[in-house]
Regions:
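Extracytosolic ligand-binding ectodomains
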Residues: 1-148
Length: 148
């Protein structure tokens, strides 16, 4: 399972090499990775989840708490990648806690309301879709993602 919260080329290149050498892998990454995936053969993958970012509610108490802790720790305001990274880490971590050591097979059943991403996967149509207010996009070329 790979979780990436940046589109920085310094991170993308080593992750691309890892993706090329693996047998099976879930990738949770920024949507901009999908836009460039024609350049990254490892990202032309059958098992990928690409979150999109709609908004961050800066009036929400959890968001304010995260922003204050981030500022106290790093001395700057969190970027959207900080929010994405937090949400993706929490989604994966809470899924592991809820479903146990073999959580990857149950990952699509996890529901998460994050600071910037909401993830609530539903089956239906030709491909699973996310039913969250803010959403994860599962593209039509990955319909068998949840048949694993």
């Amino acid at each position: 399972l790979l979780v990436a919260c940046t589109d920085d080329i310094a991170v993308r290149t080593p992750l691309e090499k890892l993706l090329e050498k693996r047998r099976q892998c879930w990738l949770i990454a920024d949507l901009s990775w999908f836009e460039d995936k024609r350049y990254y053969s490892g990202l032309n993958d059958e098992i990928c989840i690409y979150p999109t970012v709609n908004f961050t509610d800066f009036h929400d108490t959890a968001t304010l708490h995260f922003s204050k802790k981030f500022f106290a720790t790093y001395g700057s305001e969190p970027s959207r990648f900080a929010f994405i990274g937090y949400d993706q880490g929490a989604y994966v971590g809470l899924s592991a806690m809820a479903f146990g050591p073999n959580f990857v097979s149950s990952l699509p059943d996890a529901t998460y309301e994050g600071l910037i991403n909401s993830i609530h996967i539903r089956g239906g149509g030709s491909a699973p879709y996310n039913d969250g207010i803010r959403f994860v996009v599962i593209y039509e070329d990955t319909p068998h993602l949840f048949n694993q």
